[in-house]
């Protein structure tokens, strides 16, 4: 389903500095002048693959530094030229590229995104502030775009949550975490209870629980979004910023 991009109405309040302050947060969230805004759809995945924005040729940032990727241990950073573990190489998504809670109404994380439909590398390493609709109204999720894909619709966002389902790339997590596979649950959708998060490698369990705790196990929530400056906390993890 295509989503029409519409003007965004924020739940956050404007600080005197022109930044966006989450309801009970201290971090300043600064909008990008002329940046994207609208409404979008969401879903989840965790396929362990090297993300699209980790390839230098897909990057158009001031430093031309792509998203960091890691060796099979999920921790040791590898060169950007190393092939993805999902197609026979030895480069995987780093285990620290998981969502994390800032406070009761704000979280930081990462996403695969498209704003044109299909593969869209133009906004690699940009950040979007997502404001939840419906049951999660009052909460926000600030994500950095680190991946994209041919199966994405226009203005859609897919969040990498461990145990979120491997999707079309079924081999990466199996190879990275054998004998204790990190796929978890169904190919699409992943685990269906917080208790199943304990079946994942320990380093991935916090990101799995995030879905059930901060997101209250709401599947595929609708969001409004606005492009914002990437917080230092996110850039320190990905090593990339637009």
Curated annotation (Swiss-Prot):
Residues 1-21 form the signal peptide. It comes from the Eukaryota. It catalyses: Endohydrolysis of (1->4)-beta-D-glucosidic linkages in cellulose, lichenin and cereal beta-D-glucans. GO terms for cellular component: extracellular region. It is an enzyme of class 3 (hydrolase). Keywords: Carbohydrate metabolism, Cellulose degradation, Digestion, Glycoprotein, Glycosidase, Hydrolase, Polysaccharide degradation, Secreted, Signal. Glycans are attached at residues 79, 103, 217. Its main location: secreted. It is found in: Secreted. Its EC number is 3.2.1.4. The active site is at residue 47. Pfam families: Glyco_hydro_45. GO terms for molecular function: cellulase activity. One of its GO terms (biological process) is digestion. The keyword Glycoprotein applies. Expressed in larval carcasses and gut, and adult gut. PANTHER family: ENDOGLUCANASE 1. Belongs to the glycosyl hydrolase 45 (cellulase K) family. This is Endoglucanase. It comes from Phaedon cochleariae (Mustard beetle). The lineage of its organism: Eukaryota, Metazoa, Ecdysozoa, Arthropoda, Hexapoda.
